[in-house]
C-alpha cells in the first residue's frame, strides 16, 4: 500500500515493501546520505525521466544537460520548434514536472535534465542530447568531479545509433575517452 509505505520516515517494512516493486522512482531532491539506505535497491532505482521514456513511445525527445545554461537552451529550442509549427512540450527541471506533461503523438519534448536525474537513469534514450558545459558543481552530492561528469555523460551512453549527441567543442577531450553509439556532433 503506497499511502502507508511513506507515512513516516521510519517505516519498519520499507525493505520488504521495496522488494515487491519493479521500480523505485527516486526524487532528485533526496540527498546522497538518504540514498545510502536504498543502495541495495540500486538496480530498481529509476528517475522521473526514465518513467516518461518507459510509458511514452511516440514522441521526439531533446534532453539538455550541463552545469549552466540548461533552462535558456531549453527555452530557445522550444521557441524555435514552435516557430516552425512543431508540437512542443517543455519540462523537467524547468516549468512543468516531466510526468505532468500531456504528451501527444509526434510531439517534441524538450527536457532539462540535472546531474541528479541522470545519475540514476537507465531508460532515457533521447533522440537529441545536448551537453553544454561542465564545471565543478554539486560535488557534495556526487562525491567528486568524475562522478559528476559521468552522470552528465550518461545520456549519451544510453543512446542508440540513430540518435544524436551534441557536445560543446570545449568538452571534446571528455568525449574522446568514451565510446557512444549515437552520432556525435561537436
Identify what each model region corresponds to.
Residues 7-20:
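Short acidic low-complexity segments
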Amino acid at each position: 500500500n503506497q499511502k502507508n509505505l511513506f507515512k513516516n520516515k521510519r517505516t519498519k517494512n520499507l525493505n520488504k515493501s521495496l522488494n515487491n516493486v519493479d521500480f523505485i522512482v527516486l526524487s532528485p531532491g533526496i540527498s546522497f546520505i538518504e540514498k545510502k539506505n536504498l543502495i541495495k535497491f540500486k538496480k530498481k532505482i529509476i528517475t522521473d525521466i526514465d518513467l516518461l521514456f518507459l510509458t511514452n513511445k511516440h514522441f521526439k525527445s531533446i534532453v539538455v544537460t550541463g552545469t549552466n545554461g540548461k533552462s535558456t537552451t531549453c527555452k530557445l529550442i522550444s521557441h524555435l520548434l514552435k516557430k516552425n509549427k512543431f508540437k512542443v512540450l517543455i519540462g523537467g527541471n524547468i516549468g512543468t514536472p516531466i510526468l505532468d506533461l500531456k504528451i501527444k503523438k509526434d510531439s517534441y519534448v524538450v527536457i532539462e535534465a540535472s546531474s541528479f536525474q541522470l545519475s540514476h537513469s537507465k531508460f532515457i534514450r533521447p533522440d537529441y542530447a545536448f551537453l553544454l558545459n561542465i564545471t565543478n558543481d554539486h560535488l557534495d552530492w556526487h562525491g567528486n568531479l568524475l562522478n559528476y561528469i559521468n552522470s552528465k555523460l550518461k545520456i549519451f551512453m544510453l543512446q542508440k545509433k540513430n540518435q544524436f549527441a551534441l557536445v560543446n567543442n570545449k568538452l571534446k577531450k571528455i568525449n574522446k575517452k568514451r565510446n557512444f553509439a549515437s552520432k556525435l556532433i561537436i
